[in-house]
């Protein structure tokens, strides 16, 4: 399954707020479609599927990528759900987004793919690159890159830089100080339901 490239607000109306996908909030509180306002009792499977879709669409990853992240999280010590969120939050595209260099994760991914971002002084154009404590994430030292990020910073996606990151607006440089804490994950998600979804499919 490829990345979603359709109307973002339609997805937000169906799944709820997705801070990584869109800055917009739905004006209507019910899902899109002719029967959007109909209230039907959802099955447990439907609830788990919806949480999985929220996670995948917010971080802009494919189904195949999410399956790989779940497998990797299962091999980690501690909570599998927490490990899954850490893996997704520490991706380079998400880190660029959380530093305020882009208004959405798709916007941050574009910056990375087009070679506007460096990690520890080297251009990294792989959005899935896993940032680690101590990494220095910067805007490439050229006018075009800096102007793009300057414009993006006027309309940041989220108001606050999370506690595991720091950002110098004068030098366009961020630092990863640690792995993100669960309370700083902006997406409202029950990650255990996502793990259950894949456990039951296995």
UniProtKB/Swiss-Prot annotation:
Family annotation (Pfam families): Ribosomal_S4 (PF00163), S4 (PF01479)
GO BP term, pick one: translation
SUPFAM superfamilies (UniProt xref): Alpha-L RNA-binding motif
Top-rank taxon: Bacteria
GO MF, one example: rRNA binding
Region (Disordered): 21-42
Entry annotated with the keyword Acetylation: no
InterPro entries xrefs: Ribosomal_uS4, Ribosomal_uS4_bac-type, Ribosomal_uS4_CS, Ribosomal_uS4_N, S4_RNA-bd, S4_RNA-bd_sf
Family to which this protein belongs: Belongs to the universal ribosomal protein uS4 family.
NCBIfam families recorded: PRK05327.1 (NF003717), rpsD_bact (TIGR01017)
Record HAMAP family: Ribosomal_uS4_B
Purpose of the protein: One of the primary rRNA binding proteins, it binds directly to 16S rRNA where it nucleates assembly of the body of the 30S subunit.
PANTHER family: 30S 40S RIBOSOMAL PROTEIN, SMALL RIBOSOMAL SUBUNIT PROTEIN US4M
Protein name: Small ribosomal subunit protein uS4
Native organism: Synechocystis sp. (strain ATCC 27184 / PCC 6803 / Kazusa)
Gene that this sequence comes from: rpsD
């Amino acid at each position: 399954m490829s990345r979603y490239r359709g109307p973002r607000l339609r997805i937000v109306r169906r799944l709820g707020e997705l801070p990584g996908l869109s800055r917009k909030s739905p004006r209507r509180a019910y899902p899109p479609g002719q029967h959007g306002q109909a209230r039907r009792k959802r099955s447990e499977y439907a609830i788990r599927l919806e949480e999985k879709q929220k996670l995948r669409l917010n971080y802009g990853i494919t189904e195949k990528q999410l399956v790989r992240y779940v497998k990797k999280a299962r091999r980690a010590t501690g909570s599998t759900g927490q490990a899954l969120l850490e893996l997704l939050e520490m991706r380079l595209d998400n880190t660029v987004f959380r530093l305020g260099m882009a208004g959405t994760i798709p916007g941050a991914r574009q910056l990375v793919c087009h070679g506007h971002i460096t990690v520890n002084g080297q251009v990294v154009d792989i959005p899935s690159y896993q940032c680690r404590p101590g990494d220095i994430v910067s805007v490439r030292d050229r006018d075009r890159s800096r102007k793009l990020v300057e414009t993006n910073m006027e309309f940041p996606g989220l108001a606050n830089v999370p506690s595991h990151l720091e950002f110098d607006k004068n030098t366009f440089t961020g630092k990863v100080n640690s792995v993100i804490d669960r309370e700083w994950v902006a997406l409202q998600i029950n990650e255990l339901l996502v793990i259950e979804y894949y456990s039951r499919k296995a």
